[in-house]
């Protein structure tokens, strides 16, 4: 089995913590490890590192390399999309790469987002292993989440008859519903949340792409290297729209007894980590008489008094305050900021580079103050400036500096 982890998304619903420069999958939201590291470790129990493929944006490649190292999966493969084109082109690119590596047409492929929370992991792995026979038999298996409440933030999948074991035939994929429709879906008992996870054989998905997504198949059939050149020719479309909603080969396996959360909104995070009063606090927080309120801070003290049904997310350069239940609308707010060309959509005060990171501490007309962290053994490129001067103060560590034609060693001032 090959594991394909889709790690190219921007996670705009978790703004301002998630930015396009450092999106959701790299955040340490659910514990000490990032969501991507947790995802990689989840699949290391199903496949070796050499059988894991990470599909990502070229701007994230160094982040992914660091995450793979942390997870002990340095031998996993990283492929980058030339441009963002949604999940159908990303999956087809991964398939072409797998074929280029010499995989047989019968090879099974598991597709997973990079940023979901799933536990217990062992039960999840057992479910995946049990469903592989369906994929080998020509089915495209999707994994449904048993809904425990009406939820308008997820798509739904309607099932019909049981086809084998605990697998069901799929009748239809449903868009994110309104409150009334979501309640009807839960009451009906045959609807599941769409987890975005799929499993299939290469030959099955090839046939379905050819039948239902000819524009994608035309580029895919040219091979991996040609796909990199022609990637932009493929439509911007999800695998759900391109194939799953049209295919007669779909089967759904419920993730029964397994906790799943796509951590797709601030409401989802608040619900997952709140205490018995509905409150969730992270950072230097002093709160009195607050109920059903989430406050996340990073650097400064945040004091809250008599707050109800609020979400407060504070970062060094952006403060988000929103009513609970409205976090699905954060994406609209981000789109407005994009139209206004606000740099905060893309940039953080701290920016990560292959050699380390830098944090902007202060800036104004004629000056900018940065804190630069260089990883052990890493180096910055040589630079030459005509219109500005740089002054370095070394806080910790030692290094070698090239200055004109001389090399000098430096340490703390």
Specify the residue positions occupied by each region the protein language model found.
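General beta-strand structural signal in soluble alpha/beta enzymes
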Residues: 54, 80, 110-111, 142-144, ...
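Conserved core of the sugar-phosphate nucleotidyltransferase
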Residues: 120-218, 225-234, 251
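A residue-level structural signature of the nucleotidyltransferase/glycosyltransferase Rossmann-like core
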Residues: 109, 190, 197-198, 261, ...
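Generic secondary-structure signature for well-ordered alpha-helical cores
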Residues: 31, 41, 45-48, 69, ...
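Short beta-strand segments
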Residues: 6-7, 55, 110-113, 142-146, ...
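Conserved N-terminal catalytic core of the sugar/cofactor nucleotidyltransferase
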Residues: 2-5, 13-16, 20, 28-113, ...
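Residue-level signal for inorganic ion chemistry
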Residues: 26, 36, 94, 115, ...
């Amino acid at each position: 089995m090959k594991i394909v982890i889709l790690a190219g998304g921007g996670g705009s619903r978790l703004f301002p913590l998630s930015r396009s420069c450092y999106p959701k999958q790299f955040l340490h939201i659910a514990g000490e490890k990032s969501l991507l590291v947790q995802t990689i470790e989840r699949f290391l129990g199903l496949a070796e590192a050499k059988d894991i493929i990470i599909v990502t944006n070229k701007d994230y490649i160094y982040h992914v390399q660091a995450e793979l190292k942390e997870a002990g999966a340095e031998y996993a493969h990283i492929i980058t999309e030339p441009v963002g084109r949604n999940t159908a082109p990303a999956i087809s690119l991964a398939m072409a790469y797998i074929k280029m590596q010499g995989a047989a047409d019968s090879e099974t492929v598991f597709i997973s987002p990079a940023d979901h929370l799933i536990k217990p992991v062992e039960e999840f792995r057992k479910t995946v292993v049990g469903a592989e026979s369906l994929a080998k038999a020509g089915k495209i298996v999707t994994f449904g989440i048993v809904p425990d409440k009406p939820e308008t933030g997820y798509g739904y999948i309607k099932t019909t008859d049981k086809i084998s074991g605990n697998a069901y035939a799929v009748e239809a994929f449903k868009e994110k519903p309104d409150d009334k429709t979501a309640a009807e879906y839960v009451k009906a008992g045959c609807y599941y949340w769409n987890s975005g996870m799929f499993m299939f054989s290469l030959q099955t998905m090839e046939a379905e792409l050819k039948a239902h997504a000819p524009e994608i198949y035309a580029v895919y059939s040219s091979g991996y290297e040609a796909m990199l050149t022609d990637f932009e020719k493929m439509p911007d479309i999800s695998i759900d729209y391109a194939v799953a909603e049209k295919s007669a080969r779909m089967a759904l396996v419920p993730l029964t007894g397994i906790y799943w959360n796509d951590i797709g909104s601030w409401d989802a995070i608040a619900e997952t980590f709140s205490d018995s009063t509905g409150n969730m606090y992270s950072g230097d927080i002093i709160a009195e008489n607050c109920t059903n309120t989430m406050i996340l801070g990073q650097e400064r003290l945040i004091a809250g008094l008599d707050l109800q049904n609020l979400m407060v997310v504070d970062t060094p350069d952006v403060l988000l305050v929103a009513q609970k239940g409205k976090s699905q609308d954060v994406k609209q707010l981000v789109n407005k900021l994009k139209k206004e060309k606000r740099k905060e959509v893309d940039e953080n005060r701290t920016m990560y580079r292959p050699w380390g990171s830098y944090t902007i501490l202060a800036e104004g007309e004629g000056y900018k103050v940065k804190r630069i962290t260089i990883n052990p053994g890493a180096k910055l490129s040589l630079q030459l400036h005509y219109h500005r001067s740089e002054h370095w103060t070394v806080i910790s560590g030692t290094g070698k500096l090239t200055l004109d034609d001389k090399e000098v060693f430096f340490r703390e001032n």
